[in-house]
Amino acid sequence: MITDIFLYPFMQKAFIVGILLSVIIACLGTVVVHKRLSLIGSALSHSSLAGVAIGLLLGFSPVLGAVGICVVAALCIEAIRKRMPAFSELAVAITLSVGIGLAGVLSGFVKNSSDFNSFLFGSIVAIDSFELIVVLILSSVVLLVFLLMYKELFYVSFDEEAAALSGVPVGLVNFVFTVLTAVTVSVAARTVGALVVSSLLVVPVAAAIGGEESPTGFHTT
């Protein structure tokens, strides 16, 4: 029977990780789309490949390398957005270009290309216990943040100036959201691949909007 596949531990891990990532990526995607940063997933996922290459070259976990580089890239995007608010899309374009360039150069020095390709195309059935624990912790943090900061996140995503005038700590909200997005994208790249993460971040949200511009309208379409 088809349910027999869930008797295998690796399929159980893949099933759990797939469900958890689909939930938290969708949550983050709603804010990403309304902040007009739909390509941030592509920029971060390609930047994570540079972190993977660094991890493989220096002999430590490529997942940690991907997370570290992704966080740095996300903070760079936020810094450029603050410096040039009228051209915020340039932040994503610049980071995407640098990330692809670094990944391309560093990948040439990686001896075992199969490890690097596993992040490029993903391998959800190859998830180990450590990565499962990382996804469980990350999912808990993302869901907790959305429960506690739901209104603030969407207020900032629509109008940062109005949110600041209303007393919302815009800098803190943006920092927390940026770091969570970076970590989620880098971890998801290991399961579904860096080439697909950006689609998971944007396409489901675009389909859910269905002409509604309000995030609360997703549920009524």
Regions found by a protein language model. Name each.
Residues 1-9, 23-34, 51-61, 152-162, ...:
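Short juxtamembrane and helix-loop transition motifs at transmembrane-helix boundaries
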Residues 4, 9-13, 84, 92-151:
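Transmembrane helix-bundle core of multi-pass membrane transporters
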Residues 11-22, 58-72, 136-140, 186-201:
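Structural signature of hydrophobic alpha-helical transmembrane segments
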Residues 15-20, 63-68, 91-94, 132-137, ...:
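Hydrophobic alpha-helical transmembrane segments
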Residues 16-28, 41, 45-46:
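The first (N-terminal) embedded transmembrane alpha-helix
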Residues 19, 23-27, 68-76, 102, ...:
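Generic alpha-helical transmembrane segments of integral inner-membrane proteins
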Residues 30-112, 209-221:
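Short loop segments and helix-boundary regions at transmembrane helix junctions
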Residues 131-204:
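Helix-loop-helix "hairpin" substructures at the membrane interface of multi-pass membrane proteins
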